[in-house]
């Protein structure tokens, strides 16, 4: 049993982001197709089930890595990321926002169904938005880690300390993934950082972009809820 757990952890730990996204997308697509076959009377539910499974499986696989990594492991893993990983971060954030927008559109159909089906649609919609919120800010947490541990600037010149840094974490110079998630979710909830200092221009710009995206996300959720109330 322990060997099986070790192999499973090794597999999850060594999953590249693209492969992880491909696996989770495949699971979501299969779930959507099966749900449509079984629940053809509500294609909205089929879409939501596929979207929820995609987000949930992605967060679970990524969560295993995040919770298990200490400072050195975080630095080692981040240093192996490809420079083009920024494109995947942008794609992940875009998909979270797009998915939330689609959920908002689906909520307009609540009033067209029976009470039981409407409750099911509302429950799945809330779950999908919640998972998209977690996915959005987890992606920013990963991006902060990549920027912090990046060894060279945009011109290919190595940093004096061997890494960019840009954040000053109390008590450690080798933060873990959880430390970067702390930054991301603190910004998401309060739009401020109390004990972590921002010490580089690039990090300040990234924090600004993160805050604006977060505000846009909340605005879309609010608009979707109001639209659902008006149309139901």
Q: What does each model-identified segment do?
A:
Residues 26-29, 89-105, 182-186, 221:
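Hydrophobic alpha-helical transmembrane segments of multi-pass integral membrane proteins
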Residues 179-186, 194-232:
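Pore domain of cation channels
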Residues 74-94:
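Juxtamembrane helix-capping/reentrant segments at transmembrane boundaries
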Residues 42-60:
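Loop-to-helix transition at the N-terminal end of transmembrane alpha-helices
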Residues 14-38:
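The first (N-terminal) embedded transmembrane alpha-helix
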